[in-house]
């Protein structure tokens, strides 16, 4: 299990795990599966091959965030009818790679990974829901996080 910011270098070629094996499933995990991890899931579905299974979850139950829908719609993306889900409620709990976006999610993923061969990477992302101001200022914070996630996915998977 890898768990630091240096884990990207250890991952080797884009789309491969540390051992060089192809990654076939990715879970994006954050606090409530309301903002960062659903954004990552929506982006990854367009940036990674269709053969890669992509999911997202939170360590706690969250509510769908309308600002996420707004910034995704600006990019022509949608979550459809998808609602936030908890990590412990996932039907298939095995993933080749778990990308965590909040410290609490990282600790949960490391504990869950235990001695298994799953890779865990921490991609710290700011929480745009703490930003105050006008609607446009708040949307800018969400856009910034979306762009950061897109950059990380592109860098990690070479897309």
Positions of the model-derived regions?
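Conserved active-site segments centered on acidic
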Residues: 4, 12-88
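Structured loop/turn residues at beta-strand edges in well-structured enzyme cores
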Residues: 21, 93, 118
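Conserved small-residue
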Residues: 33, 72, 98-99, 149
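Mid-chain, well-packed structural core segment of small domains
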Residues: 93-112
């Amino acid at each position: 299990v890898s768990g630091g910011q240096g884990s990207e270098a250890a991952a080797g070629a884009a789309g491969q795990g540390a051992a060089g094996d192809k990654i076939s499933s990715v879970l994006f995990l954050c606090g409530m599966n309301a903002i960062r991890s659903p954004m990552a899931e929506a982006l990854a579905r367009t940036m990674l091959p269709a053969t890669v299974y992509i999911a997202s979850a939170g360590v706690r139950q969250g509510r769908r965030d309308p600002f996420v829908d707004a910034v995704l719609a600006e990019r022509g993306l949608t979550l459809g009818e998808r609602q936030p889900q908890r990590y412990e409620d996932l039907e298939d709990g095995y993933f080749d790679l778990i990308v965590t976006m909040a410290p609490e999610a990282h600790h949960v993923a490391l504990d869950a990974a235990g001695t298994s061969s799953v890779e865990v990477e921490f991609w710290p992302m700011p929480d745009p829901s703490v930003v105050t101001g006008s609607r446009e200022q708040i949307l800018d914070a969400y856009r910034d996080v979306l762009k950061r996630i897109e950059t990380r996915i592109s860098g990690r998977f070479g897309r």
